[in-house]
A protein has these predicted regions:
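Catalytic phosphate/metal-binding cores of nucleic-acid and nucleotide-processing enzymes, i.e., regions
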Residues: 1-125
Length: 125
């Protein structure tokens, strides 16, 4: 669920647990562990933490914000709509970064296993 807060002429959108880093970690861990049953939960946790740490270090805020120009007429509905879309855009961007990292990790593992299998086949000769 998304909640909204108005401060002066700005609207902030955040998930119902707040706009903390830890909520995003918990939510994304649940999502990827559920949707990646063949990948170790430890690997998933490492990648989720790494990606979110990189996002936090780069200055990403874990909320969506919409500011109204002082010359424009303020509209709560429009502000909420813009803030919500900015929040969801950030969330989906982070989620796709994690998915890409997981795919790379799985393909590296697959490549290593394939290489080991080839070596084992050569030994059988």
């Amino acid at each position: 669920m998304i909640r909204y807060t108005r401060v002066n002429n700005s609207v902030f959108a955040y998930f119902d647990k707040g706009y903390s880093y830890t909520y995003w970690v918990d939510d994304l861990l649940r999502y990827f562990i559920k949707h990646s049953p063949n990948i170790s939960s430890c690997i998933v946790a490492d990648i989720v933490h790494d990606v979110l740490s990189e996002c936090a270090e780069s200055g990403m805020k874990f909320y969506g914000e919409a500011k109204c120009h002082p010359d424009d007429e303020y509209s709560q509905a429009i502000g909420q709509h813009i803030a919500k879309h900015r929040l969801l855009d950030k969330y989906l961007t982070v989620r796709s970064r994690i998915a890409i990292r997981l795919a790379k990790d799985v393909s590296k593992t697959h490549y290593r296993l394939e290489k080991i299998a080839k070596i084992d086949r050569k030994k059988d000769w």
